[in-house]
């Protein structure tokens, strides 16, 4: 039976809830140059453009139709019922994991629902989109809050905590990730090095160079609940469940 699980989630899990992804063919990068909306330099050049870009995602997330799907709910169930240690690391900046009930959660790329003071680095929960009362309350004069999002060229958040968890886990699961963007792409190597079982859940069939031991190909909303049930039943993931 597993004692220490690390789960990594990427854009694929949120796409099943109706959120557009950054890197798909019809995704947001098609409408903007990356350097204009997702770099510190782009923000320094045109903060209003960057705010509009993230406001469009904020509004989509709060439109009333985007909700956690079965995969989000299954991971929240795993947290509630699993007797061992669990850490869910997400590359997503939405709050669908939180809405599903997950609390043992780390947003390595930041959170769309928060702004950050550029001077103190204190974060603030956003009740409204950027541009509406978006000054900090920690400085005099108040500083303009920037999106609490990790941009290209910036260090992902919580890396020490993530690596500590990977060093000690006996099961690593990646759900809906491309597996091509570092440092997250290297998490499977770390887990394998420390003897963990590694499982990938993805819509696409695995690359022949994949380092994962097991692959589940299909929708996260269908496969993750089955995976969670297997874990909670005290069974080891095997070829009967994975490819």
Swiss-Prot record:
Which cofactors are named for this entry?
A: Zn(2+)
Q: What is its EC number?
A: 2.3.1.286
Active site annotation, chain numbering: 109
Provide the top EC class: transferase
Which reaction(s) does the protein catalyse, per the Swiss-Prot or TrEMBL entry?
N(6)-acetyl-L-lysyl-[protein] + NAD(+) + H2O = 2''-O-acetyl-ADP-D-ribose + nicotinamide + L-lysyl-[protein]; N(6)-succinyl-L-lysyl-[protein] + NAD(+) + H2O = 2''-O-succinyl-ADP-D-ribose + nicotinamide + L-lysyl-[protein]
List, alphabetically, the SUPFAM superfamilies matched: DHS-like NAD/FAD-binding domain (SSF52467)
Gene Ontology molecular function terms on file: histone deacetylase activity, NAD-dependent; NAD+ binding; protein-malonyllysine demalonylase activity; protein-succinyllysine desuccinylase activity; zinc ion binding
Q: Which UniProt keywords apply?
A: Cytoplasm, Metal-binding, NAD, Transferase, Zinc
Cofactor note (record): Binds 1 zinc ion per subunit.
Which subcellular locations apply to this protein?
Cytoplasm
- Locate the residues binding Zn(2+): 117, 136
For this protein, the record's Gene3D superfamilies field holds: SIR2/SIRT2 'Small Domain, TPP-binding domain
Residues noted as binding substrate in the record, renumbered to the chain? 54, 57
Q: Name one Pfam family in it.
A: SIR2
Which residues does NAD(+) bind?
Answer: 10-29, 91-94, 176-178, 202-204, 220
Give all residue intervals belonging to the Deacetylase sirtuin-type domain. Answer: 1-234
What does the record say about domains? 2 residues (Tyr-54 and Arg-57) present in a large hydrophobic pocket are probably involved in substrate specificity. They are important for desuccinylation activity, but dispensable for deacetylation activity.
Instruction: Give the similarity note.
Output: Belongs to the sirtuin family. Class III subfamily.
Please describe what this protein does: NAD-dependent lysine deacetylase and desuccinylase that specifically removes acetyl and succinyl groups on target proteins. Modulates the activities of several proteins which are inactive in their acylated form.
Q: What else is known?
A: This protein might be subject to alternative promoter usage and might also encode a protein with a 7 or 13 residue-longer N-terminus.
Name assigned to this protein: NAD-dependent protein deacylase
Gene name of the encoded protein: cobB
């Amino acid at each position: 039976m597993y004692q220490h699980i690390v789960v990594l989630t990427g854009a694929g899990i949120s796409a099943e809830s109706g959120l557009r992804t950054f890197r798909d063919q019809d995704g947001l990068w098609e409408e903007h140059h990356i350097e204009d909306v997702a770099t510190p330099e782009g923000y320094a050049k045109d903060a209003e453009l960057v705010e509009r870009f993230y406001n469009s995602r904020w509004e989509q997330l709060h439109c009333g139709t985007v909700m956690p799907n079965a995969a989000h709910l299954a991971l929240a169930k795993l947290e509630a019922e699993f007797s061992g240690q669990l850490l869910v690391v997400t590359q997503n900046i939405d709050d669908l994991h939180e809405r599903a009930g997950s609390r043992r959660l780390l947003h390595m790329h930041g959170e769309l629902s928060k702004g950050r003071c550029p001077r103190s680095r204190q974060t603030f929960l956003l009740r409204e989109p950027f541009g509406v009362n978006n000054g900090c309350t920690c400085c005099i004069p108040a500083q303009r809050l920037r999106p609490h999002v990790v941009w290209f060229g910036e260090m992902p958040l919580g890396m020490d905590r993530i690596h500590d968890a990977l060093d000690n886990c006996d099961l690593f699961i990646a759900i809906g990730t491309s597996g091509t963007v570092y440092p997250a792409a290297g998490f499977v190597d770390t887990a394998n090095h420390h003897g963990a079982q590694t499982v990938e859940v993805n819509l696409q069939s695995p690359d022949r160079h994949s380092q994962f031991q097991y692959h589940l190909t299909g929708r996260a909303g269908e496969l993750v609940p089955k995976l969670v049930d297997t874990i909670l039943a005290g069974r080891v993931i095997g070829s009967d469940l994975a490819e």
